[in-house]
Swiss-Prot record:
GO terms for molecular function: ABC-type transporter activity; ATP binding; ATP hydrolysis activity; ATPase-coupled transmembrane transporter activity; bicarbonate transmembrane transporter activity; chloride channel activity; chloride channel inhibitor activity; chloride transmembrane transporter activity. This is Cystic fibrosis transmembrane conductance regulator. ATP 1 binds at W401, S434, G458, S459, T460, G461, A462, G463, K464, T465, Q493. It is a multi-pass membrane protein. The gene is CFTR. There is a cross-link at K688 (Glycyl lysine isopeptide (Lys-Gly) (interchain with G-Cter in ubiquitin)). Epithelial ion channel that plays an important role in the regulation of epithelial ion and water transport and fluid homeostasis. Mediates the transport of chloride ions across the cell membrane. Possesses an intrinsic ATPase activity and utilizes ATP to gate its channel; the passive flow of anions through the channel is gated by cycles of ATP binding and hydrolysis by the ATP-binding domains. The ion channel is also permeable to HCO(3)(-); selectivity depends on the extracellular chloride concentration.
């Protein structure tokens, strides 16, 4: 970045914003890059501003019992805010005084007032000086207020981010992602956008008082008639605003409903294509869109009337002010024209400035209160550690994730005193009222010495991760003691990758030691993976590691934990995503050898790990089931495998444990009852859900499902929501900001769960921050990286003692025992970390885009032509009236000497000039009112255009090949359907209408002035030309700066979400300061772009003002020097010239806004033009069968099969020379794969993580770019339509897809099967008992990815889909990942029964599942290495043989035979359900 010219700019350069000229020239000539942007001034840096506000906020916290954030802001920014307010007031005063001088100039042409004629030239000079002074006062004031608003936002951003890193996990569990992002985006944007209007809350009343005093002098009491009309108009507009809000709130639910399903489809587009659900998903989304558009049109019509009311209100204001006075007294032209000018200023103050200012203060104070509540929330407390201790010990430790009853009761008592819930937690008491819950850990005791390995095991939800969280201090124990040194390293269950290189992710700020680093790389089996990258370990990883496989991410996370020199290593299931061989090697070389001298706590479920552990701790339902050595475990607890693997029979469950996921669902939502109902007098259970109830995660480490808290009590009436916990104006439906860079109000969307007709749990589902931290899926992110510079700070750590020379942790690069942690980031490299790829859209919207947009709907062209015809009629009538006016004015001038009272003084004389002028005003405004009929069809048609574009874009995305979609980010696609469609629906129609209307007004005004005084036309032409040239010059740079600003906003929120995902890791490594620095750098990058955009915008506005001032000076002196005694002519010219200024500037600004909004249209067109998948039309050889099943095709003419056979009939598959690529022109993931599978054969896929097993399954479905040939039952994939080919397969993907809709829709989106068939299949796969527990059963609506279902239930849903389709070939991609044992056994049983005659291709890490396969396909280095039977693989050197230890090999085949006998006993309990109790399959 370059140094800013502002630092050396002169006073005049700052006043006229001339210092921005270099960037404007560069932006006009070429595309701007980040390196072209000027550096942020030190006074605007995030470090400086955050430190300034943080210091005042700490002072406020220390000095007062009830601290106020607004007091801290006042001490930081008040005096500058007040100074710019005074400048703004002076600028507005000049505007109010201008009509006085105008009236004096008009009066100087009165024949009875020749005395004034001599000073007309001086009055004109004074009027011109006022026009010159106004921009010199106004623009610096507006820029200064925008600048202060920007500084407040930056300081608040930083304060919120720092607070977020300090929040306790308990608080994070209560805050949703949407609330946090909304707090940063929508709330804080109010300071940026609204601070310039804040002063009008006092300026507008003073201005109205001044104007009414001046009008009283002209019209006496009748002036208040116009004011009364304006007040009534303001109230009417407020009422229309309420109607708009009502329609918007109704529509917001539908928008969110559409976006939820669209988001689910985009994130799972590969599954959608694999299931051939493109048409079904398109129909579901379009049905919701239809309802949404009905509400959109209603809201647009009301907004249209609201906008039009302002335009034609001027006539009524002037009429109501002048007519009462004229009925009593005579009125002269000077008073009419002065009144018109006064009323224009008065109308703006009453109907625009004051209401906007009030709304600004309301929104700003609300945002400040929310942020204040957030800043006072409970922080994460580090435990007190003894750095000299060498042991890890727990004594009688009990812990709850939820707050206890005592805390809640005390909080309720405190809050009831002032009838106010502090910290925004007003729903906290009721949402947790009965949720005392089961302790997540209770009476835990263990002790391990230095260098020992403790293996922690237990079924799902037993409390294993909570145990680690308690050691780290994330979970505060309610009882007992914890003892350890505090020097901890942590590896999360769900791998977290920060944007950067592999090397940076592993070192993570610790001083670099080559020997240690290489040892860790080798021990974590990363050498081979790194060697495949051209950049080796300097390869850039995207946010979340999206370019890596799950196993690679897991190994990098483990390497990060191992590299750090700590006393205690907490490893939370680090091998979950690894294949058997890799897991075994890493456990031996890393955990057992490399870390042999370190204290380790490993969460695992593998028997081999337990055997090699020094101590074993088995948890069951939060309690210590066993603690001791493995040999003691075998002798004392022979049934330990049931606790470890979750094989408890139903009858052995405790009463609490018997409650299934459905009972937990009941707990989550509500029992209908009054808030005052005693705990033992709850009413009948109901699934009716209230919005104020605490929203829980679907899949959190806290796992409330396994905490088993059965009941809840909530109020019937919605509780008010304040603070970050909810929006006060929407008590039932939480407002959620999905897209932080969306500037529209509709971006804050209340959640609606009514996706389809049928029962649903009507609760505002949110994803808590804690859930984000514990999600296993990797979100799409930016695939660029960040490097650090050499500037570092030291963090002293206690040195290790008694280590051997071979111990990697004894080595130090530096002389002391400190760790070097980098705090500096280069801004250029930061762009590589987070920035999206720059969109290839021209700086200015092309004419081709406008033409294409206009021709989308044929009616739009006719509407525009009709608007033009009406405008020509307006101009014609106006010109006729003006000619009459001029002729009658000349007649009156001749008769004026014979009249007792001059015709200029009597308003009702039919031949008077001002009466004709009054007729003209009436006719012109009447025609303007006809704009209602002109503009309404335009707005209506533009919304229809938006509907068509949305439909085309949705169809294009669903039909696009995966090779194209793989190059796009899910967030970018979703932005097209959210932000850009919102712009097309809401902003673009009314903005286009405003621009057209303003343009016509300007053209009409210029025509009137030119007819009255042709000389003025000579001044008008160059002024309009100058405006057009200036607009084009500014537009090139401003649009690029706006694009850079938008791109710069993304890293801020990306970094926030990245930090939250890895918050536990950050705290464990003490990396908060570094990430705060990184966040400040991201803020500074955005600030640099935004500040430059504000400055160039002021430059443009100032130049427009200068051009107008020159124009007005020319008009004024031409009128005075060339006009005779035409008082009416001078009044019309000067009045219209003053109006031209504001209207023309408004029109130019509207044209710039239209151009900016049309960029959304360009992006939509770009998506519409995406290529489609190669889907050959059905040939005469293939016809859909009369059977309703889409997975079957009747073969009528094919040499491979007999006539009238159903395809596929056997499932025989032949693959020849298959090569697969994810992206056109990319590297081949698979090369020359050839094999043949017999009908009904089961084939297992073997290979290291990332070897291409999932890619092979995708290639079979033609989801990736493929070369070669595949045949099924003799039919080649080249001779069959793509959709029919995919319907031949049944798929259970690695990433389960459950969209928002009913059970029936999720199982059968096309509605092909009746209920009886669906229930039969549900019974086969073990889903009947689950579905029957929900109200509405098959019509129960699942939302948010089916969060009320366990992962196992979701897998069973996928299995049921394949059974319904009667697929002959089944593809399974790691179906047992994260499955509880019982669901796993159900899937195995179903595969044996329902798919006994089907061909099965299985990618799996569990050895037991692979033993069901007859043959194995081994993939290595993108090629097929082996395709053999299990006996052959065990008899030779292979990866499969290496993964199985010699002692276990003899038992493999007998185990395969006996597994069929044991399975029924483990799943027998599935059918022992009663009406009140259902087995919990999430063990």
């Amino acid at each position: 970045m370059q140094r800013s010219p502002l630092e050396k700019a002169s006073v005049l350069s700052k006043l006229f914003f001339s210092w921005t000229r270099p960037i404007l020239i560069k932006g006009y000539r070429q595309r701007l890059e980040l390196s072209d942007i000027y550096q942020v001034p030190s006074t605007d840096s995030a470090d400086h501003l955050s430190e300034k506000l943080e210091r005042e906020w700490d002072r406020e916290l220390a000095s007062k019992k009830n601290p106020k954030l607004i007091n801290a802001l006042r001490r930081c920014f008040f005096w500058r805010f007040a100074f710019y307010g005074i400048l703004l007031y002076l600028g507005e005063v000049t505007k109010a005084v201008q009509p006085l001088l105008l009236g004096r100039i008009i009066a100087s042409y009165d024949p009875d007032n020749k005395q004034e004629r001599s000073i007309a030239i001086y009055l004109a000079i004074g009027l011109c000086l006022l026009f010159i002074m106004r921009p010199l006062l106004l623009h610096p004031a507006i820029f200064g207020l925008h600048h202060i608003g920007m500084q407040i936002r930056i300081a608040m951003f930083s304060l919120i981010y720092k607070k977020t890193l300090k929040l306790s996990s308990r608080v994070l569990d209560k805050i949703s992602i949407g609330q946090l992002v909304s707090l940063l985006s929508n709330n804080l944007n109010k300071f940026d956008e609204g601070l310039a209007l804040a002063h009008f809350v006092w300026i507008a009343p003073l201005q109205v008082t001044l104007l009414m005093g001046l009008l009283w002098d002209l019209l006496q009491a009748s002036a208040f008639c116009g004011l009364a009309f304006l007040i009534v108009l303001a109230l009417v507009q407020a009422g229309l605003g309420r109607m708009i809000m009502k329609y918007r709130d109704q529509r917001a639910g539908k928008i969110n409903e559409r976006l939820v399903i669209t988001s689910e489809v985009i994130e799972n587009i590969q599954s959608v294509k694999a299931y051939c659900w493109e048409e079904a998903m398109e129909k579901i989304i379009e049905n919701i869109r239809q309802t949404e558009l009905k509400l959109t049109r209603k809201a647009a019509h009301v907004r249209y009337f609201n906008s039009s009311a302002f335009f034609f209100s001027g006539f009524f204001v002037v009429s109501l002010s002048v007519l009462p006075y004229a009925l009593i007294k005579t009125i002269i032209l000077r008073k009419i024209f002065t009144t018109i000018s006064f009323c224009i200023v008065l109308r703006m103050a009453v109907t625009r400035q004051f209401p906007w200012a009030v709304q600004t203060w309301y929104d700003s104070l609300g945002a400040i209160n929310k942020i204040q509540d957030f800043l006072q929330k409970q922080e994460y407390k580090t435990l007190e550690y003894n750095l000299t201790t060498t042991e890890v010990m727990m004594e009688n430790v009990t812990a709850f994730w939820e707050e206890g009853f005592g805390e809640l009761l005390e909080k309720a008592k405190e809050n009831s005193n002032d009838r106010k819930i502090s910290n925004g937690d007003n729903s906290l008491f009721f949402s947790n009222f009965s949720l005392l819950g089961t302790p997540v850990l209770k009476d835990i005791n263990f002790k391990i010495e230095r260098g020992q390995l403790l293996a922690v095991a237990g079924s799902t939800g037993a409390g294993k991760t909570s145990l680690l969280m308690m050691i780290m201090g994330e979970l505060e124990p309610s009882e007992g003691k914890i003892k350890h040194s505090g020097r901890i390293s942590f590896c999360s269950q769900f791998s977290w990758i920060m944007p950067g290189t592999i090397k940076e992710n592993i070192i993570f700020g610790v001083s670099y030691d080559e020997y240690r680093y290489r040892s860790v790389i080798k021990a974590c089996q990363l050498e081979e993976d790194i060697s495949k990258f051209a950049e080796k370990d300097n390869i850039v990883l995207g946010e979340g590691g999206v370019t890596l496989s799950g196993g690679q991410r897991a190994r990098i996370s483990l390497a990060r934990a191992v590299y750090k020199d700590a006393d205690l290593y907490l490893l939370d299931s680090p091998f979950g995503y690894l294949d058997v061989l890799t897991e075994k090697e890493i456990f031996e070389s890393c955990v057992c050898k490399l870390m042999a001298n370190k204290t380790r706590i490993l969460v695992t479920s593998k028997m081999e790990h337990l055997k090699k552990a020094d101590k074993v701790l088995i948890l069951h339902e939060g309690s210590c089931y066993f603690y001791g050595t493995f040999s003691e475990l075998q002798s004392l607890r022979p049934d330990f495998s049931s606790k470890l693997m979750g094989y408890d029979s139903f009858d052995q469950f405790s009463p609490e444990r018997r409650n299934s996921i459905i009972t937990e669902t009941l707990r989550r939502f509500s029992l209908e009852g009054d808030a005052a109902v005693p705990w033992n007098e709850t009413k009948k259970q109901s699934f009716k859900q209230t919005g104020e109830f605490g929203e829980k995660r679907k899949n959190s480490i806290l796992n409330p499902i396994n905490s088993i808290r059965k009941f809840s009590i909530v109020q019937k009436t919605p509780l008010p929501m304040n603070g970050i916990e909810g929006e006060s104006e929407v008590p039932v439906e939480r407002r959620l900001s999905l897209f932080p860079d969306c500037e529209q109000g509709e971006a804050i969307l209340p959640r609606s769960n009514m996706i389809n007709t049928g029962p649903t749990l009507r609760r505002q589902r949110r994803q808590s921050v804690l859930n984000l931290m514990t999600r296993s899926s990797v979100n799409q992110g930016q695939s660029i990286h960040r490097r650090t510079t050499a500037s570092t700070r030291k963090m002293s750590l206690a040195p290790q003692a008694n280590l051997t020379e071979m111990d990697i942790y004894s080595r130090r690069l530096s002389q002391d025992s400190g760790l070097e942690i980098s705090e500096e980031i280069n801004e250029e490299d930061l762009k590589e970390c987070f920035f999206d790829d720059v969109e290839s859209i021209p700086p200015v919207t092309t004419w081709n885009t406008y033409l294409r947009y206009i021709t989308v709907h044929k009616n739009l062209i006719f509407v525009l032509i009709w608007c033009l015809v009406i405008f020509l009629a307006e101009v014609a009538v106006s010109l006729v009236v003006l000619w009459i006016l001029r002729n009658l004015s000349s007649q009156d001038k001749g008769n004026s000497t014979q009249s007792v009272n001059s015709s200029y003084a009597v308003i009702f004389t039919s031949t008077s000039a001002y009466y004709i002028f009054y007729i003209y005003v009436g006719v012109a405004d009447t025609l303007l009112a006809l704009g209602l009929f002109r503009g309404l069809p335009l707005v209506h048609t533009l919304i229809t255009v938006s509907k068509i574009l949305h439909h085309k874009m949705l169809h294009s995305v669903l039909q696009a090949p995966m090779s194209t979609l793989n190059t796009l980010k899910a967030g970018g696609i979703l932005n097209r359907f959210s932000k850009d469609i919102a712009i097309l629906d809401d902003l673009l129609p009314l903005t286009i209408f405003d621009f057209i209307q303003l343009l016509l007004i300007v053209i009409g005004a210029v025509a009137v002035v030119s007819v009255l005084q042709p000389y003025i036309f000579l001044a008008t032409v160059p002024v309009i030309a100058a405006f057009i040239i200036l607009r084009a010059y500014f537009l090139h740079t401003s649009q690029q700066l706006k694009q850079l600003e938008s791109e710069g906003r993304s890293p801020i929120f990306t970094h926030l979400l990245t930090s939250l995902k890895g918050l536990w890791t950050l705290r464990a490594f003490g990396r908060q300061p570094y990430f705060e620095t990184l966040f400040h750098k991201a803020l500074n990058l955005h600030t640099a772009n935004w500040f430059l955009y504000l400055s160039t915008l002021r430059w443009f506005q100032m130049r427009m003002e200068i051009i107008f001032v020159i124009f007005f000076i020319a008009v004024t002196f031409i009128s005075i020097l060339t006009t005779g005694e035409g008082e009416g002519t001078v009044g019309i010219i000067l009045t219209l010239a003053m109006n031209i200024m504001g209207t023309l500037q408004w029109a130019v600004n509207s044209s710039i806004e239209v151009d900016s909004l049309m960029r959304s249209v360009s992006r939509v067109f770009k998506f519409i033009d995406m290529p489609t998948e190669e889907s050959k039309p059905p040939t005469k050889s293939f016809k859909p069968s009369k059977d309703a099943q889409l997975s079957k095709v009747t073969i009528t003419e094919n040499r491979h099969v007999r006539e009238d056979d159903i395809w596929p009939s056997g499932g025989q598959m032949t693959v020849k020379d298959l090569t697969a690529k994810y992206i056109d022109g990319g590297n081949a993931i698979l090369e020359n794969i050839s094999f043949s599978i017999s009908p009904g054969q089961r084939v297992g896929l073997l290979g290291r993580t990332g070897s291409g097993k999932s890619t092979l399954l995708s290639a079979l479905l033609r989801l990736v770019n493929t070369e070669g040939e595949i045949q099924i039952d003799g039919v080649s994939w080249d001779s069959i339509p793509l959709q029919e080919w995919r319907r031949a397969f049944g798929v259970i993907p690695q990433k389960v897809f459950i969209f928002s809709g009913t059970f029936r829709k999720n199982l059968d989106p096309y509605g092909q099967w009746n209920d009886q068939e669906i229930w039969k299949v549900a019974d086969e796969v073990g889903l009947r008992s689950v579905i029957e527990q929900f109200p509405g059963k098959l019509d129960f609506v699942l939302v948010d990815g089916g969060y009320v279902l366990s992962h196992g239930h979701k897998q069973l849903m996928c299995l049921a889909r394949s059974v319904l389709r009667k697929a002959k070939i089944l593809l399974l991609d790691e179906p047992s990942a994260h499955l509880d044992p019982i669901t796993y056994q159900i899937i195995r049983r179903t595969l044996k029964q329902a798919f006994a005659d089907c061909t099965v291709i299985l990618s799996e890490h569990r050895i037991e599942a692979m033993l069901e396969c007859q043959r194995f396909l081994v993939i290595e280095d993108s090629r097929l290495r082996q395709f053999e039977s299990i006996q052959r693989l065990l008899s030779e050197r292979s990866a499969f043989r290496q993964a199985i230890g010699p002692p276990e090999r003899p038992g493999l085949l007998p185990h395969r035979l006996s597994s069929r006998q044991r399975s029924p006993s483990r799943i027998a309990a599935l059918k022992e359900e009663t009406e009140d109790e259902v087995q919990d399959t999430r063990l």
